[in-house]
Amino acid sequence: MLFGGRQLSPEEEKQEQEQKKFDLLKYDGVKAMKIGQADYALRCFTEALKMKDDLEIHDYLSQVLLRQGELDAAMNELRTLGDAEPENAQIQIRIAQVAYMQEDYVAMEAACQQATTLEPENAEPYFLHAQALKGQQNPVGAIAMLTKAVTLKEDLAEAYLLRAQTLLAMGDTASAETDADWLLENVGDHEDVLLLKARVVAAKGQPQEAIAIYDKVIEVNPFQIDAFRERGRLRLDLGDKAGAEQDMQTVMELDPQQLADVSGEYSAEGIEQRVKQAYSTINPLGL
């Protein structure tokens, strides 16, 4: 060493070189991740972890794997983080989010319960817990969690939306409409909000009013298949066969496979019969 510094032993030299290599792999991996070079980032992070365990790299690795659609591998990395930091609620929230993508609602619920234990005043895990319960066909429990979520965070629009959708599916149109109206007032003419309102109004037996709202949905998003399909059903019920045919034709143009098992190829039976058959097979509310 220069300037009178101590000469490193061969073992220390080796450790220093390994640390430099580790740091370089980690740095290159982060850089690659930020510019979208996922494959190279994965290689860097994997090689770095072979040299030394590092929680920050496990975190980065989970993010890259998630972007790649490698849900199981991403979950493994998050589990490693969760085991290392059992008091970190944010890790449990991320585990719940990935479990939702995997449709593993039992694991999702467990992560949410741990997160709410750690952060009882955080609305997010209650919302996620509601999604888990809904996935387990427990709408009553889901509504309870959503109510808790909006109690903690009064402007949590996604909780109002999911609660309204769940209430509507249960047949409680009055309560669903209350949430829908809150959303219209506080969120405005958002596609999902308008679609919800149209479904509520249709469920109340007001087809003309519902059609007018479906018109607004289509103005916001001209490719909203559900809006065309559901509006067409209402038009058919009102005797507007031409309008129903037009909407069903649009649905088939936007997504030909959606009705392939119902309508098939055009045949001599006539468009009216095909439209009736298609609409009778599809749940008009999409619930």
Residue ranges of predicted features:
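TPR-adjacent "capping" and linker segments in tetratricopeptide-repeat scaffold/adaptor proteins
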Residues: L2-L24
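Terminal, low-structured helical/coil segments at or just beyond the last alpha-helical repeat
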Residues: L2-P10, E245-Q246, E253-L287
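Alpha-helical segment of the N-proximal tetratricopeptide repeat
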Residues: E18-E56, Y60-R67, Q90, R94-E103, ...
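Helix-start (N-cap) detector for alpha-helical repeat units in TPR-like alpha-solenoids
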Residues: F22, L55-E56, A89-Q90, A123-E124, ...
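Structural signature of tandem alpha-helical TPR/SEL1-like repeats
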Residues: G36-Y40, Q68-T80, Q102-Q114, Q136-K148, ...
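Short coil turns that delineate tetratricopeptide repeat
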Residues: K52-D53, P86, P120, E154, ...
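Canonical tetratricopeptide repeat
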Residues: Y60-L61, R94, L128, L162, ...
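TPR/TPR-like (Sel1-like) alpha-helical repeat modules
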Residues: E185, R229, R233-A260
